[in-house]
Amino acid sequence: MGSKLCMKRLMRDRQRYDELDSEGLGIYCHFSDENMMNVKAMVIGPEETPYEGGFYFFDINFSNQYPLVPPKVNFCTLNSNVRFNPNLYKCGKVCLSILGTWSGPGWTTTMNLITILIDLQSLMNDNPIQNEPGYEKRYWKKDEIAASYRTLVSYYNLCVAQFQMMDMTPPGFECFKEVMERRFLKNEIFYKRWRDFMMPLEGQHFTNRYAGMGTIIHSNHWSSMIDDRLEQLRFKYPLCEDKQQDTLELGGAKEDVNPEKDTEEPDTKTVSEVKPNTRKSPKEQAKLYEIGFTKAGEDGKLWVVKGYKSGMRRWVRPKS
């Protein structure tokens, strides 16, 4: 059991998480009633990056000195063939300045669990190799190396961070299994993009300093695996698939098989649980605007730029 200050802050962290839009941000936590000093977290790879839709697990352990010192964080989406990020080691080490394991601004007592998870998600950007210090000066063919690394991360993001994590979920993270499967089922737009990118690379050999001895791309195999898994999950979660399909076909030439339902009030709870993986916030990146700037999103609703301690900016819905 931690100190009084530690327990108070952990309870506040849990409250912050309960107020968080987990599905929208792609950040999930499991708090153990038996051990409040440990939190299991799953961060979903951001859209339009090589990490998109991946399930990235973190084991977070707090000490009695929290929040005076940061917790210890271990990366648990592991595979011997690839290092997913210069800041995420194959051994599970996480290099982040606020954790005291990387150069840069350190931990402050105003930071919390959500701060850490958002910072971890920010590592999963479109060009992850640039996270390595001195990258611009160190590599001669830096553009070629960056492209090769993005390709490998994207490949293993599907093979390892999605399929392997669903089939061989690390101990302690089984609590996220249903969320993983439902998100996989709703991510068909991503799989189309993945196929468009990977299929022309079938049989090609990629090497990179973060990818061991190199990798041969087997996109045909994984493409069929996607189809098989989607079919299994449609059978397992028929409601999720039916609602998603209805939503994807809105505005198209689909014939309404039950027009009487047009007059019924929608079940907002059900719709929110099965919403497709489409953008609702403004299409422009939040980092282009000042904190507090408001703008109508793709959903027609008002969004505001929120700033975080890490320097990251995101579109969020203003609190009513």
Regions found by a protein language model. Give the residues of each.
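Short amphipathic C-terminal alpha-helix that caps PH/PH-like domains
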Residues: L113-M124
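Arg/Lys-rich, low-complexity, intrinsically disordered basic segments
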Residues: P259-S320
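Strand-helix-loop interaction patch of compact alpha/beta domains
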Residues: M1-G100, G104-M111, T115
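Short, charged low-complexity linear motifs
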Residues: M37-E47, K177, L288-K295
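Charge-rich (especially acidic), low-complexity segments
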Residues: Q130-E260
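Generic recognition of well-structured, leucine-rich alpha-helical segments
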Residues: M11-G24, M36, Q65, V69, ...
